[in-house]
Amino acid sequence: FLRHVADAALDRLRIAGGGTGGHLYPAIAVARAWMRGGPERRVLFVGTARGIEARVLPREGLPLETISAAGIIGHSIARKGWAAALMVRGIAESIGVIGRFQPHVVLGVGGYASAPAVTAAWLRRRPIVLMEQNVVPGMTNRLLARFAFKVAIALPGAAAHLPPGKIVDTGLPLRGEFTGGPPREASFWEGPLRVLVFGGSQGAHALNEALAEALPLLGEDARRMRFV
């Protein structure tokens, strides 16, 4: 996916969504690859003032425009009505962003901010690509997939939940600081095997519990390992 993005004969990319690191950081990797295509390349993120993007993107030197959006899933009827009103407002704001920035393609990365931004792209007839980082796609990407030209997935299992014929299995885009680093020194491998366990969003608690329950199955091997 990054290779195709970097080689595309396009100049302006708008990235829609965010809210959590799982949505945002792969999008940053795509943005960096896009801009390596030449000095004329421009990228613009669209998110909310409450999401992680409002804190991270200024640090990364990447431009962000904020729109109105709020989550709907798991909230009261009153909250859903309020979120629906924000959705309409966010679509109008996103149409304004499209008019100013004139993107050649819109990339939706998931999260509730993606919904109004991608819907606006569909209304303005802009090519839409979605990026799904999870094995079970979120509600936003499942609903928006019908409008997309392609859906880039990080894990093959996601294809079962998305429209056939649009899937591109690209893997997860990684930022440059996590690839191509120097080889580990020999001392890195000394001592117990160190295992870092972490999950994101809804899977974090379940993953930690599953590991704790599985530790007795390791028997004596567990003494030679350190879990964090």
Listing of model-derived features with the role each one plays in the protein:
Residues 12, 40-44, 63, 127, ...:
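Residues at the starts of beta-strands that form the adenosine-phosphate
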Residues 23-35:
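Short amphipathic alpha-helix
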Residues 38, 97-102, 189-190:
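Glycine-rich phosphate-binding loop signature in dinucleotide/nucleotide-binding domains
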Residues 41, 122-182:
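Active-site-proximal region of nucleotide-activated glycan assembly enzymes
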Residues 51, 56-60, 183, 187-228:
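Donor-nucleotide binding loops and adjacent catalytic segments primarily
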Residues 74-105:
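An amphipathic, basic-hydrophobic alpha-helix
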Residues 93-106, 114-129, 142-147:
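Glycosyltransferases and closely related glycan-assembly transferases
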